[in-house]
Amino acid sequence: MSNPVVLNLHLISDSTCETVAAVARSALEHFKSVEVNEFVWSCINSYEQIDKIMLTIEKDKYNFIMYTMFDDDIRKYLKQKAGIHEIPCIPILSHVIREISCYLNIKKDPYINTSIGLDDEYFTRIDAINYTIAHDDGQNLWDIDQADIIILGVSRTSKSPTSIYLAYRGYRVVNIPLINSIELSVDLSKMKNKLIVGLTIDIDRLIEIRRARLVSMKNQNNYGYVDYEHVLMEIRETKKICAKNGWPIIDVTQKSVEEIAATIIQYFTKMQH
């Protein structure tokens, strides 16, 4: 079997690199056989920084540069340096900007500082991630009123990964496990301005997931955790609570975290209008 092609992908931006990274990763989805080493160079705004990047690049390897750079002089310098070493250097936004400029017959602004907006978005996302991690699995509910979204569900219904995914999108999320015979420590029925969503799942699939969990934890004596009647009662109680309060409920059976999160975002967007 031949060795895979290894590509050193250098992502360069005068801001956070999130835009160029998203485009690059999407493009590389079309090359599954390629092994990618990703190097992220953010907040690059000087000739000296570009010189340092070039010094770190292993010239005898496959290298590829993708960038977003709004300062014309810095951008030209980057392309010049890449050209000297015969490294492909691709601007991900230039073609789009050029097409808009030609279509409208308007010149683009010579310089526009996008770093402020991106930085605001970045720090909002970091704040959402920190908040969501601190409020995983029903923890720290004293400031639940600061959440954008509250997720309820029995154990192993993808509450935590869905919450983290939403946090990465900038939503502050609390997830709370619903456990039989244990009352919630907060009265969610009074939180009229919050999106509260319940997650449910096919009982056979849930038991299968829980059994695998017990095996991985070497704790196969927790019979109630996988008992059919007990699990059925948990699922029914979740549906009952959501129906009583008019909260939407999502069946996560065979759904990816991305699909679950997309549905929740749709509910959230609808609630805001």
From Swiss-Prot:
<dbReference type="GO" id="GO:0016776">
    <property type="term" value="F:phosphotransferase activity, phosphate group as acceptor"/>
</dbReference>
<keyword id="KW-0418">Kinase</keyword>
<keyword id="KW-0547">Nucleotide-binding</keyword>
<dbReference type="GO" id="GO:0004674">
    <property type="term" value="F:protein serine/threonine kinase activity"/>
</dbReference>
<comment type="similarity">
    <text>Belongs to the pyruvate, phosphate/water dikinase regulatory protein family. PDRP subfamily.</text>
</comment>
<dbReference type="Pfam" id="PF03618">
    <property type="entry name" value="Kinase-PPPase"/>
</dbReference>
<comment type="function">
    <text>Bifunctional serine/threonine kinase and phosphorylase involved in the regulation of the pyruvate, phosphate dikinase (PPDK) by catalyzing its phosphorylation/dephosphorylation.</text>
</comment>
<dbReference type="InterPro" id="IPR026565">
    <property type="entry name" value="PPDK_reg"/>
</dbReference>
<dbReference type="InterPro" id="IPR005177">
    <property type="entry name" value="Kinase-pyrophosphorylase"/>
</dbReference>
<protein>
    <recommendedName>
        <fullName>Putative pyruvate, phosphate dikinase regulatory protein</fullName>
        <ecNumber>2.7.11.32</ecNumber>
        <ecNumber>2.7.4.27</ecNumber>
    </recommendedName>
</protein>
<keyword id="KW-0723">Serine/threonine-protein kinase</keyword>
<dbReference type="GO" id="GO:0005524">
    <property type="term" value="F:ATP binding"/>
</dbReference>
<feature type="binding site">
    <location>
        <begin position="153"/>
        <end position="160"/>
    </location>
    <ligand>
        <name>ADP</name>
    </ligand>
</feature>
<keyword id="KW-0808">Transferase</keyword>
<dbReference type="GO" id="GO:0043531">
    <property type="term" value="F:ADP binding"/>
</dbReference>
